[in-house]
Every structure is written in structure tokens, then in C-alpha cells.
Amino acid sequence: MSGHLHDTLYEDVREQICRKIYEGVFQEGEKLPAERTLAQMLDVSRITLRKSLELLANQGLIVKEAGSGNRVGLPNRGTPSSTDMIVLIAPAENPFFSEFIRAFQEYGQNHDTMVLYAEKPRRETLADSIYRFYQKHLYNIVIWPEDKEVDKEKLRRLRALGMNMVFFDTDCGIPYGDSVVLDNKRAVGQLNSRIAKRGIRRAGYIGWESGPRYSGSLREQAVREAKGADILVRLPWERRREARNLAYEYLKNISEELPPAMIYADWECGDAVSNALSLLDREDILLAGIDDFPGAREKHAIVCRQDMENTVKEIFHCIQIQNQKPAQWQAEIYCIQGKIVEY
């Protein structure tokens, strides 16, 4: 058998063992089956198996212990690889997406990196989607999960297998991937400051009551810590397609006097509250929040825009560090300052 075929066989066996590690068949700290048993399980010779185990040991996925066999290891470190291509998983239906991917692709083109876009998976889990790219030897991936649940244990295994991961708008990847997010606390503080400059001392807040929405929960927390909210409207995330009607019904039936300003959590909440206030003939109420919503300019809203240029730059920097300094790398949350626009 030629050297190339040998190498391919060793790699195939290595991948079979990696899959069992990813699926949790072989757990961290557990001993692998004895060589004879494992060779029979994988239908390969013991000589082939030993070479494949050597590849895994070099990667840190198994630890050879004299007299006690091979134990599974899950190192949490970066992996040197080619950055000629980076995978981006993101929700295409989000209007903010077009601005995000445009900035992402432009930065990639300027730095000789191709961007392979994949829509946020609908049927398979996020981890399984990432694993498919691992199988295709694409080891650098940026994930914007939005409301997609993340299996932290599987992220841990993916990191050990060699995936370099950066997450946008969430901290769900910590400590197995970096996070690049808007500086939500600062953004809310800036909005409150601009509202106060207009002589307004009372403001309400509209956000989401459920869903794994990292940014939404941080923004509500920042509002509470700053000075609270005269009214707090939480729309159910699972009914977000009805957000306009829900916001209208809530504000129409509220017993308290509406405050002179409303802070919204994101563009969807901004659109919902803007529509509700128009129907209630309360367009005198100032709107302020994160990201533009349709009609923000006409409503003279105060908007904190996310800085796409610096956000994407930081994401690429995170990927670079994971590749170039794998042993020193530790996952961090990078907060990017937004830009205030007053229409």
C-alpha cells in the first residue's frame, strides 16, 4: 500500500474515533477500549490503529499512560489551521443580517479570506451543524446563534477536536469560543443620557420575556440598573411575528400613564412599539433603542447603531489569535462600542 493510502487510512480511523468523542461514546478521562478490542470495533489492524492513536495523541485528544492504556483528553486551546476560508453561520431572515454579512465579506476580501455562509440550521442542532464543517476540514467558524440553543458540552468537544469558534451577540460559547458583542451597558447609558438632554426624566422599556437572548437580557438589566423603567413591556419571543399586535394590545390596555420616552431592545421591538404608538395617536413619545427600525428616521428616534466595521475586525482578530497562539489562547468577551444617531 502506498504512503498516501496509508495516511488516508490512518486519518479515516482517527476521524472515526473523533466522531465517537464528539458523540460522547468516549468521554473525557475515560480509558479507550484495549487496542485489540478497539481494532476489532473499527475493523482495522492494530498497526493501523496505533498510528491513528499517535495522531490523536499529538492533537491532545488522548493521553497515553504507561501501564494503563489511553485516556480521552479534551484540551481547550486554539488550533493552527488555514484561514483562507472562514465559515459564517447566521440567521438570514434577520434584516440586520444583510449589513452584518456585507461587512464580513468586505473584510474577508480585503484580507484574502473567503467567507462561506451557512444559514442558521432549522432541523439539526447548532453543534451538529458545526461538526459537519469540521468533517470537511473547515476549522474556523463564526456563529450568530440568535435564538438557537447551544449544547455547551458538545461545544467543548468541538473545541477539543480542533474547531476555532467565535460567537456574535451572545456569550453562550464561553469558555470554548470567543464572544464579540455590543457594549450593551454603555449603549443603554448613552441612550439614557441623550433622553435626559431633552429634559425627559421618565422612560419605559420594551423587550423580550423569553428565549435565549443574551443581548436582550443585558439591555433590560442595564435599564434596571440605570434608573429603572416606568413601564416594562416584555413580549414573548416565540410570538415575535405578532410583536406589533402584542405591543399595541399591551399599551392600549395599560392602566398607567405612558412615559414620555420608550427604550426598545432591538429593531423588532422598535418596530412594534412605533406601530403601537402610531395606532394610539401617541407619536409625541420619544423612541430610543438599539438598531434602526423601519421608520426610525421619520419618528426622529435616537438609535444606537452597532459598529459593524469594528465588530467584524474584532471577530477576524479572534480567529487569528486562536490560530497563531493556540496554547496561550483563552476565551474572552469583547465588547464593541455602538454609535449614537439622533434623527
What are these regions (language model features)?
Residues 1-41, 124, 132:
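Extreme N-terminal segment that seeds HTH/winged-HTH DNA-binding domains in transcriptional regulators
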Residues 5-6, 30, 64-93:
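N-terminal helix-turn-helix/winged-helix DNA-binding helices
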Residues 11-12, 23, 76-139:
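Amphipathic helical "hinge" segments at domain boundaries
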Residues 16, 252-343:
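Flexible loop/turn connectors
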Residues 28-64:
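N-terminal helix-turn-helix
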Residues 147-187, 291-301:
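Flexible loop/hinge segments that line or gate small-molecule binding clefts
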Residues 176-205, 243-249, 305-326:
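Hydrophobic alpha-helical segments within soluble ligand-binding/sensing domains
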Residues 190-231, 328-343:
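An alpha-beta-alpha
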